[in-house]
Amino acid sequence: IFIFIFGLKENKNIYWFLLPFIFGFAFLSKQVPAAYILISLLIVLLYNSFFNDKKTNIKIFSLLLISSLIFIFLLILVLNLNGIPINSFVQQYILYPLSIGQSRVGSYEINLENFFLKYKLIHIFLIPYFLINILKIFRIKNYYKNFNFFLFLIIFLSVISLIFHQLLTKNQNFIFFLIPLLAALIHIETTKKKKKIVIISLIFLLCFFST
């Protein structure tokens, strides 16, 4: 995620070239939520492409394509050197996780209680962060194509992806690390407010008692 953020902010070739390798290794180590995060970032990348010039978009997508092909080539090479059939790899890393995911999605009911109330401590910070940035669209000219708005989309979609992953896996809760992260982002947004001391104190108390 950080590599992607740096790529959007600085638009350096090295970040776009490294991104497929980073996500490739992430996918190999843990298919989900890596796949969910990848989908979220692709949405932001496509949204960002609407505001880039043609030359910039060609450069970004060319680097991503070349890097992805190199990673796939190296992966196939490693599999062949170790005598691992490609079909076995596809079955183990792609088809099998998909079958598990489909069965869990089909048998699990996502409703208001599961999605919001179960993780209400995260939403206490996520909802204000969402509203602050949506209001900025109306208050700040062209904010919807500003880097800060792209950053908001990355954070928001990533949080939603992690919550969705947590609901499906039903493993030990690990996403509560998002609380101090979201608290810090709200803190940054409120540093120029008149009653910032009160707001910061409230954020600190909520963060302290929720974690």
List each language-model region with its residue ranges.
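Transmembrane-embedded, aromatic-rich helix segments that form part
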Residues: 31-47, 128, 175-179
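Hydrophobic/aromatic-rich transmembrane helices and adjacent perimembrane loops
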Residues: 35-36, 167-198
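Hydrophobic, aromatic-rich transmembrane alpha-helices
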Residues: 120-147, 158, 183-187
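Perimembrane helix-loop-helix junctions
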Residues: 36-69, 140, 184, 188-192
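Signature aromatic-anchored transmembrane alpha helix within multi-pass, membrane-resident enzymes
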Residues: 66, 192-211
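Membrane-lumen/periplasm interface segments of specific transmembrane helices
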Residues: 61-104, 162
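Membrane-interface alpha helices of multi-pass inner-membrane proteins
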Residues: 15-33, 37-42, 70, 156-166
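Short hydrophobic alpha-helices at membrane interfaces in multi-pass membrane enzymes
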Residues: 3-25, 54-66, 145-157, 197-200
